């Protein structure tokens, strides 16, 4: 581990020199790339230097202890040694985590697709609850929400809603949300008070750069139509809505949120690229042996990941066996405890995998 940390620190120092070089700064694309790499290394280098300082102070205190004769001073030094040893152990654990392989998509914006599953109108209302939960979570982080498309029901639910979250490391937080979400509650229309179970499916896709995926324009068919609102009635007198089909895969994307057909085309293309990227990643992951797949969650849309139980005020995260009795706050965007626990579980898996290798 120390060899890797030394290499990282040397690389960081080299980059520090490069990004201050006027000749490098003249090439803005190259300079931005180096600045990004420099910023990514800064956290680990700062922690490594803190670790080295603590090690040096520990050795100095041990030397002082061996030479000290005063009882009170020896007790003070021993206390300092104990504190430093605890700090060093903590530093080592943090450095192990910082050295874990980074998901290349973690710092990207995300597209989130929510689709009502089993349960009819109640499932559509639950899809709307999830949409609000994610947008409230985004607000807490200062992220921006951009609606891409929505198929609303007459009672305020969503058969399907697609939106984008723009913000710092959005994918690193939201990637665990892919899968089947289940709700247990008494619908407003249920006169007997019987609890119903409904589901909604969530897919989380990282925003894709043009360099990540290339699409042949000849492989795309674009159809335009008039945007519709509740119940399917037309809300626009021009053909501004766009349906984009990727012919080789059959993937279809619709976008009607903007009044401009051009803007809807741009949005639809972004979502299409994200879906094609996800498809390619899924095919790549399928080739990995089963024992290496993440136990935190495969990201499979068919995987049941979480239950929201209204009568008990309970949220249960099935992948890590975590249950919280704070349903109302959770649905208002207070998701941090679960997301942090999922991140910790993923880190533990990666550390275990590194140990096995």
Curated annotation (Swiss-Prot):
The organism's place on the tree of life at top rank: Bacteria
Q: How is it modified after translation?
A: Methylated by PrmC. Methylation increases the termination efficiency of RF1.
Gene Ontology molecular functions: translation release factor activity, codon specific
- The main location is cytoplasm
**Signal sequence residues:** none
Q: What is this protein called?
A: Peptide chain release factor 1
Q: Which organism is it from?
A: Clostridium novyi (strain NT)
The UniProt annotation puts the region (Disordered) at 284-305
User: What protein family does this chain belong to?
Assistant: Belongs to the prokaryotic/mitochondrial release factor family.
- N5-methylglutamine is found on 233
The role this protein plays is: Peptide chain release factor 1 directs the termination of translation in response to the peptide chain termination codons UAG and UAA.
Keyword presence, Cytoplasm: yes
- Whether Cytoplasm counts among this entry's keywords is yes
| Record keywords, A-Z | Cytoplasm, Methylation, Protein biosynthesis
GO terms for cellular component: cytoplasm
Q: Localized where?
A: Cytoplasm
């Amino acid at each position: 581990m120390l060899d890797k940390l030394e290499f990282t620190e040397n690389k960081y120092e080299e980059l520090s020199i490069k990004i201050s070089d006027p000749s490098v700064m003249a090439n803005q694309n190259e300079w931005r790339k180096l600045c990004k790499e420099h910023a990514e290394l800064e956290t680990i280098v700062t922690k490594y230097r803190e670790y080295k300082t603590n090690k040096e102070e520990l050795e100095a205190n041990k030397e002082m202890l061996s030479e000290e004769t005063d009882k009170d001073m020896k007790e003070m030094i021993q206390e300092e040694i104990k504190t430093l040893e605890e700090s060093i152990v903590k530093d080592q654990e943090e450095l192990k985590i910082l050295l874990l392989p980074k998901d290349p998509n973690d710092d990207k914006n995300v597209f989130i697709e929510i689709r009502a599953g089993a349960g009819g109108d109640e499932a559509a209302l639950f899809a709307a609850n999830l949409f609000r939960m994610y947008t409230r979570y985004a607000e807490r982080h200062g992220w921006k929400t951009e609606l891409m498309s929505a198929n609303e029901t007459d009672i305020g639910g969503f058969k399907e809603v697609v939106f984008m979250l723009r913000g710092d490391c959005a994918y690193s937080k939201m990637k665990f949300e892919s899968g089947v979400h289940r709700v247990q509650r008494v619908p407003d229309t249920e006169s007997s008070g019987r609890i119903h179970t409904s589901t909604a499916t969530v897919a989380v896709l990282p925003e894709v750069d043009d360099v990540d995926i290339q699409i042949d324009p000849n492989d795309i068919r674009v159809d335009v139509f008039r945007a519709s609102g509740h119940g399917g009635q037309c809300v626009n007198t021009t053909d501004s809505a766009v349906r984009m089909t990727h012919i080789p895969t059959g993937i279809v994307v619709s976008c009607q949120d903007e009044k401009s057909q051009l803007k809807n085309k741009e949005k639809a293309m972004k979502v299409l690229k994200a879906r094609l990227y996800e498809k390619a990643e899924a095919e790549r992951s399928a080739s990995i042996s089963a024992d290496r797949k993440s136990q935190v969650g495969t990201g499979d849309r068919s995987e049941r990941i979480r239950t929201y139980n209204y009568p008990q005020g309970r949220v249960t995260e099935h992948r890590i066996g975590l249950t919280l009795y704070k349903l109302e706050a959770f649905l208002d965007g207070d998701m941090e405890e679960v997301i942090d626990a999922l991140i910790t579980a993923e880190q533990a898996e990666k550390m275990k995998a590194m140990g096995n290798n």
